[in-house]
Regions:
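Beta-lactam-recognizing serine transpeptidase/beta-lactamase-like catalytic domain environment
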Residues: 2-5, 83, 211-221, 262, ...
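Periplasmic/cell-envelope proteins involved in peptidoglycan metabolism and beta-lactam response
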Residues: 1-286, 374-386, 395, 503-507, ...
Length: 588
């Protein structure tokens, strides 16, 4: 028994040793397999496919920061600022960071932030907590630097500042309709700001950085420089723009009119020197401003031009040999197709100059009926009616122009005194700029241009010169536009009055008064159109309502630009003729 027990004991020890050896080998094998797996995984991540891990790491640490660029400045032709960008700050929150730091409390610092932003604390909390895991939300835009510095000093977790800019318009309402404005993201919304948005915007740069868990920049990876925005130099002269707006605004108020518009053009270059509307608005504070007030009426509103087209009728008649410069016309009222054609005052006969001076509907209608119906259509078109000016401003209309093949006699007659077509004030200004250049058509421009300017002769110079001289009589005693006369200067103008068309296409008992012309008449430099819409102060004729405004504006322009007086002297006294006096009472 004892011998058997002794033989079994070594056997058990041997089996136990074998078991331990087997377990050790298994453990070593598992360890080796684990090491092999880890080495394989490391090789996979580091050598074969490292991109995914790098991407995951970059997502947690890399940040792209925009390097903003300021919007370009808009200036007048002499470099005076009309629109500039001023530095401001945006206040934004990181909701996750705020939440991780304990959220919004009722402490003094959070109350101070709410007061600074003019937001009740409960509303501020609701906005930030609306998406607790979010990483970005604006709290305020375009905050002035002083307020932004105050908020920064509060050192609230998750509240950050971002640089941005805000547009400022030094001329305010004077240039509002022309310049327009931008939105909170500095995108052009109206006027030149919208039309030239790409030119003014530039291209922001980028900066890629690596941040640690606390948001601190620990490495600059790369950067792309921003492309500076372009500045824009307009054709506008800020001095003349202010003058035009002031006189127009006063006239609208004095005549209790619905609105008024005026356009001033350089005859020799086609540059728009001033473009104004009244009433206007403050582009620096748009709160409460109706959209209707933002409309640039000089390019959007159309009206029948009335008597302002009569110089072109006379030009066409002279060119076609229907009349001569010294012809005398029978201007006794007559009827066409049951409609009476008459003038404001009755004249038995008038010279060709008298037809323009007295604004005779009878005279110009007889000239029109003596020519083919296509004659006036062609002449009006040559001077730019029915065609967009392509000035580049958003919202411009090209007016309404007849395309009919057959015309009745009454349609031909009324077409000669400005009915049956519609134009914008800007289009009419282009017509008179062409008249002022003695028949040379030049494209209009809202940006400053350098001569030579593309041009095209559309009418014989001698005929246009003759008619311009005739137009001088309108502002002399006996003319319908005597109230436009300017001491010391000769001006060539035409006044007009037209009934407004209602929404149903019928004429209503409201009027538009306008005066268009060039000065100085001896060698025209400027063309000006003044439109007063629906005057309610008792007078509505162009000669009484818009002519005085024309005289005030053009007189100021000539003096501001140091144009030498050209009025004829009165003999030995060497005095300039004062083209003022009682005439037809401004009825034209």
């Amino acid at each position: 028994m004892k011998a058997a027990a002794k033989t079994q004991k070594p056997k058990r020890q041997e089996e136990h040793a074998n078991f331990i050896s087997w377990r050790f080998a298994l453990l070593c094998g598992c360890i080796l397999l684990a090491l092999a797996f880890l080495l394989g995984r490391v090789a996979w991540l580091q050598v074969i496919s490292p991109d995914m891990l790098v991407k995951e790491g970059d997502m947690r640490s890399l940040r792209v920061q925009q390097v903003s660029t300021s919007r370009g400045m808009i200036t007048d032709r002499s470099g005076r600022p009309l629109a500039v960008s001023v530095p401001v700050k945006a206040i934004w929150a990181d909701p996750k960071e705020v939440h991780d730091a304990g959220g919004i409390s009722v402490g003094d610092r959070w109350k101070a932030l709410a007061n600074a932003l003019n937001i009740p604390l409960d509303q501020l909390s609701a906005r930030i907590n609306a998406n607790p895991k979010g990483r970005f939300i604006y709290l305020a835009r375009q905050v002035n630097p002083d307020m932004a510095d105050y908020i920064k000093k509060l050192k609230l977790p998750g509240i950050h500042l971002r640089e941005e800019s805000r547009r400022y318009y030094p001329s305010g309402e004077v240039t509002a309709h022309l310049i327009g404005f931008t939105n909170v993201d500095s995108q052009g919304i109206e006027g030149v700001e919208k039309s030239f948005d790409k030119w003014l915007t530039g291209q922001p740069g980028e900066r890629i950085v690596r941040k640690d868990r606390y948001g601190r920049v620990i490495e600059d990876i790369s950067s792309t420089d921003s492309q500076a925005a372009h500045n824009l130099t307009l054709s506008i002269d800020e001095r003349l723009q202010a003058l035009v707006y002031r006189e127009l605004n006063n006239a609208v108020a004095f005549n209790k009119a619905e609105s008024g518009s005026a356009v001033l053009v350089d005859v020799n270059t086609g540059e728009v020197l001033a473009m104004a509307n009244s009433p206007s608005y403050n582009p620096n504070n748009l709160s409460g401003t109706p959209k209707e007030a933002m409309r640039n009426r000089t390019i959007t509103d159309v009206f029948e031009p009335g008597s302002t087209v009569k110089p072109m009728v006379v030009m066409t008649a002279l060119q076609r040999g229907v009349v001569r410069e010294n012809s005398v016309l029978n201007t006794v009222p007559y009827r066409i197709n049951g409609h009476e054609i008459k003038d404001v005052a009755r004249y038995s006969e008038l010279t060709l100059t008298g037809v323009l001076q007295k604004s005779s509907n009878v005279g110009v209608s007889k000239l029109a009926l003596a020519m083919p119906s296509s004659a006036l259509v062609d002449t009006y078109s040559r001077f730019g009616l029915g065609k967009a000016t392509n000035l580049g401003l958003v919202g411009e209309r090209s007016g309404l122009y007849p395309q009919k093949q057959r015309w009745s006699d009454i349609e031909r007659a009324t077409f000669s005194f400005g009915y049956g077509l519609m134009v914008t004030p800007l289009q009419l200004a282009r017509v008179y700029a062409t008249i002022g250049s003695y028949g040379i058509y030049r494209p209009l421009s809202i940006t400053k241009v350098d001569p030579p300017v593309p041009s095209e002769r559309v009418f014989p110079e001698s005929i246009v010169r003759t008619v311009v001289h005739m137009m001088e009589s309108v502002a002399l005693p006996g003319g319908g536009g005597v109230k436009a006369a300017i001491k010391g200067y000769r001006i060539a103008i035409k006044t007009g009055t037209a009934k407004k068309v209602g929404p149903d296409g019928r004429y209503i008992n409201k009027y538009i008064a306008y005066t268009a012309g060039v000065a100085p008449a001896s060698q025209p430099r400027f063309a000006l159109v003044v439109v007063i819409n629906d005057p309610q102060a008792g007078k509505y004729y162009g000669g009484a309502v818009s002519a005085p405004v024309f005289g005030a504006i053009m007189g100021g322009v000539l003096r501001t630009m140091n144009i030498e007086p050209d009025a004829l002297t009165t003999g030995d006294k060497n005095e300039f003729v004062i083209n003022q006096g009682e005439g037809t009472g401004g009825r034209s």
